[in-house]
A protein has these predicted regions:
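Carbohydrate-interacting/catalytic domains
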Residues: 1-248, 273, 283-293, 562-565, ...
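Hydrophobic residues within beta-strands of alpha/beta enzymes
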Residues: 50, 153, 301-303, 419, ...
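Short glycine-biased active-site loop of nucleotidyltransferases that positions the nucleotide triphosphate
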Residues: 64-65, 170, 311-316, 360-367, ...
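Short, flexible loop/turn elements at secondary-structure junctions
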Residues: 67, 147-149, 173, 184, ...
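Substrate-binding/active-site clefts of carbohydrate-active enzymes
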Residues: 213-214, 234-247, 256-448
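Conserved alpha/beta catalytic core and glycan-binding cleft of carbohydrate-active enzymes
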Residues: 415-417, 432-599, 606, 627-684, ...
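Arginine-selective low-complexity/disordered segments
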Residues: 771, 775-776, 781, 785-791, ...
Length: 810
């Protein structure tokens, strides 16, 4: 061994690397310029012989074995850095030429690290995770992970025989970030991180930022390049950015991709089902689902979580791979096709997202580097006793950054139109689901989670700032105020909130036998007292058809399926008329008999029965009516868009209301009868004189009803009803919803009235002589009278002269 080379050895550092306990292995490994020359060191445990080959000259320099564990070194006569490769001969006789991972610099800037440490690196997913890339002339995969308390982190996989000594990662100062570029690797390889905790115990972890995962029950991460897909939905995205969704129709079909439609599982040579063969690929299901959605008239779909999760029974709500679409249905490119195809069919896609908790699986986020990286250490703060899951530490910048960037990731990389945030109430309350002594109050002694509040405001502010039309929806089940209010007004900043209060009250009401509903009339009308306190979405979600709750049809009262179906039609019709956007879980549109089971397909076979096929037709008609009538969506969040007509008829269990816009001719009248009584001549007050045409009736035979409809247009009469001067008389079928279009009585235009007045004036003028003519006539008559008087005077004088002459003769 050369003395110069021996003197350059850091034997303590070599021991750290050999025992794989070095937090910063590139302090030794790779090229280092010294006074004696260019020192190159490498550690390959299974290597028998190594040599350095300079790229510029092709000259080879044998490396000396400095530690029999596989640590080699060579001193090259050069005072500057030089590009090189390593010629490796393994102990099994095989040899290869590789590039040294430790000859490549960091991909992080100081700005990247500073932003991450502040929790504001919203594009951190471009750094963290595994990224196929080219560095200089070298192609390979760049790995990065955050493990702040780890002694050492390595990338392991088939490519290095899962040996954690081979590719030990570089630690970037005190940031807790580890990174390494491994040349020669390609997309498709599986990998994990081997993390040594502070006690020196190794753990295998999936990549928290990994873009793809193995199919369960395997759980390794898979390298994938998500930048290669060719999108064709630019027109959709541009239109979305310019559109205010609150003034547009939003009717959402909630879907679990794994059970909406399934295939017969394939069998292997032993007769066992092939894992995952029961699922349709993202590409296959995209075509089938889009065709169904368009026919049914929905505007959006909402997917139960597609992020990777190990347990089918969690429905996706116990996520381990937040940055990876589940491999159950295909690759990331397949899911991109799904999203792109939906947009080309003008269908929006909302993704369920779970920032409230995560599972304890040993390969996941729990105890990530041997410490509580993502969760709280104190179980009173960091665990859900009922769910058995862990709670995020929202006060830690790296955790906030992980979650906020993840929400943005699905919008930016997969073009999601929005996210629906699950279990927000569990985030906001420190005592959620806990008994006294099981939780820790905040600094003010209250039960509000101040850190979660700040996190939600932060996330929603970032989304608002993008101005791309993507929305954030909260599933918040309490009366927490200002969920959808602006952050500047001390709100949480969500775009929409699920109206759980309406759902619970209405389901409680509708499940009563119609005879008893008159005693619960307030549950039907109560929601309008707070309808404008938030921007609500009305939901009949998956939560209402599981855990023994039965299907929506099963909740309805009635001795026969026909009676249940009539109640269900009334429920759906009332929901469509009530202010707020709409959501319905799959299978409930055709009245599925059984509650939802994630392990099998929906009961599509029931559509062979007219009751179910006609129920499906009814929901289809409701959706198309909804989209065609601006009154049903333009003023969802403006009190001017709704007006009660009848909200006191508890005896008959009837309510009536108007949905309105600024245009009278777009007004709709809803009459809802939740009783079993028929009313042949029911008087209804109307907003103005005009014609009222029934455009939908849930009792129509086309929807499975008895056909007790109002087939003729109703002309209003000047007869007071419901404190209105105009009214109509209609037939009200039992358990039915009627919708009437309202056409105001036509008034003669003001221009025509003026024309009539002018014509009458001209006619009068023509019939009467002019003033000048009258004056001439009067003057003529005056002259005639004067002449007549003169003649009379002359005759008198003549007569007097004659009398005088006669007297003189006498």
């Amino acid at each position: 061994m050369e003395k110069n080379l021996y003197d350059l050895m850091d034997w303590a550092g070599i021991e750290e690397i050999v025992y794989s306990e070095a937090a910063n292995p590139d302090g030794l490994l790779g090229p280092h310029v010294t006074e004696s020359g260019l020192l190159i060191q490498a550690y390959i445990p299974t290597a028998e012989k190594l040599a350095v080959k300079l790229k510029r000259t092709g000259k080879e320099y044998p490396m000396e074995l400095m530690d029999e564990a596989g640590f080699f070194a060579a001193l090259i006569p050069s005072k500057t850095m030089a590009s090189y490769s390593l010629l490796v001969t393994y102990d099994n006789g095989m040899s290869e030429e590789i590039l040294d991972p430790y000859s490549f610099g960091s991909c992080y800037t100081d700005g990247d690290i500073k932003k991450f440490e502040s929790g504001i690196h919203y594009g951190i997913f471009e750094k963290m995770g595994a990224h196929p890339m080219k560095v200089g002339d070298a192609e390979g995969v760049y790995f990065s992970v955050w493990a702040p308390c780890a002694m050492r982190v390595s990338v392991v996989g088939d490519f290095n025989l899962w040996d954690g000594r081979r590719h030990q990662m570089r630690r970037l100062g005190d940031s807790g970030i580890f990174e390494l570029f491994i040349p020669g690797l390609k997309a498709g390889i599986i990998y994990k991180y081997e993390i040594k905790n502070s006690n020196g115990d190794p753990m295998l972890k999936s990549d928290p930022y990994g873009n793809y995962c193995e199919l369960r029950p395997s759980n390794a991460s898979v390298v994938w390049d998500i930048s290669q897909f060719q999108w064709s939905d630019q027109e959709w995205l541009e239109k979305r950015a310019k559109t205010n969704s609150k003034e547009q129709p939003v009717s959402i079909y909630e879907v679990h991709l794994g059970s909406w439609l399934r295939k017969e599982a394939e069998l292997d040579e032993t007769g066992a089902a092939v894992n995952g063969s029961e699922f349709y690929n993202y590409r296959e299901i995209a075509v089938k689902l889009a065709e169904y959605i368009k026919d049914m008239g929905y505007t959006h779909i909402e997917l139960l979580p597609v992020m990777e999760h190990p347990f089918d029974g969690s429905w996706g709500y116990q996520v381990t791979g937040y940055y990876a679409p589940t491999s159950r249905y295909g690759t990331p490119d397949d899911f991109m096709f799904f999203m792109d195809y939906m947009h080309k069919q003008e269908i929006g896609v909302i993704l369920d997202w779970v920032p409230a908790h995560f599972p304890r699986d040993s390969f996941g986020l729990a105890d990530f580097d041997g410490t509580c990286v993502y969760e709280h250490k104190d179980p009173r703060q960091g665990a859900h006793p009922h769910w058995g899951t862990l709670i995020y530490n929202y006060g830690r910048p790296g955790v906030r950054n992980f979650l906020i960037a993840n929400a943005l990731f699905w919008v930016e990389k997969y073009h999601a139109d929005g996210i629906r945030m699950d279990a927000v109430a569990s985030m906001l309350y420190l005592d959620y689901g806990k008994e006294l002594g099981e939780w820790v109050p905040n600094i003010y002694g209250g039960h509000e989670n101040l850190e979660a509040m700040d996190f939600l405001k932060h996330l929603n502010s970032v989304f608002k700032g993008r101005k791309d039309g993507a929305v954030v929806i909260a599933e918040e089940s309490t009366a927490w105020p200002k969920v959808t209010a602006d952050v500047r007004e001390d709100g949480l900043g969500f775009d929409y909130k699920w109206n759980m209060g309406w759902m619970n009250d209405f389901i409680d009401y509708i499940h009563y036998d119609p005879y008893f509903r008159k005693h619960h009339y307030g549950e039907l009308t109560f929601s309008m007292l707070y309808a404008y306190s938030e921007d609500f979405v009305l939901v009949f979600s998956h939560d209402e058809v599981v855990h023994g709750k039965g299907s929506m049809l099963g909740k309805m009262p009635g001795d026969t399926l026909e009676a249940k179906a009539a109640n269900l039609r009334a429920a759906y019709g009332f929901m469509m008329g009530h202010p707020g956007k709409k959501l319905l879980f799959m299978g409930q549109e055709f009245g599925q008999l059984h509650e939802w089971d994630e392990n099998k397909s929906l009961d599509w076979e029931v559509l062979e029965h007219p009751l179910h096929s006609l129920t499906k037709d009814y929901v289809k008609a409701l959706n198309h009516l909804y989209k065609s009538q601006p009154a049903l969506y333009q003023y969802d969040y403006d009190p001017d868009g709704f007006e009660w007509v009848e909200c006191t008829d508890s005896k008959d269990s009837i309510v009536g209301f108007l949905r309105k816009t600024k245009k009278n001719e777009e007004t709709l009248l809803f009459i809802c009868n939740f009783d079993t009584m028929t009313h042949e001549k029911y008087m209804v007050g109307v907003p103005f004189a005009g014609k009222y045409k029934e455009i939908l009736n849930s009792d129509s035979q086309a929807f499975g009803g008895e056909g007790r409809v109002n087939s003729r247009v109703k002309t209003s009469k000047k007869k007071e009803a419901d404190e209105r001067q105009d009214s109509i008389e209609i037939k009200v079928a039992p358990l039915s919803i009627m919708v009437f279009s309202c056409t105001p009585e036509e008034e003669k235009p003001a221009v025509k009235k003026a024309a009539v007045k002018k014509a009458e004036a001209e006619k009068t003028k023509a019939a009467r002589p002019s003033v000048k003519k009258l004056r001439r006539k009067r003057l003529k008559r005056k002259k005639q009278r004067q002449k007549s008087l003169q003649r009379k005077k002359q005759r008198r004088k003549s007569l007097q002269r004659k009398k005088q002459r006669w007297k003189s003769r006498q």
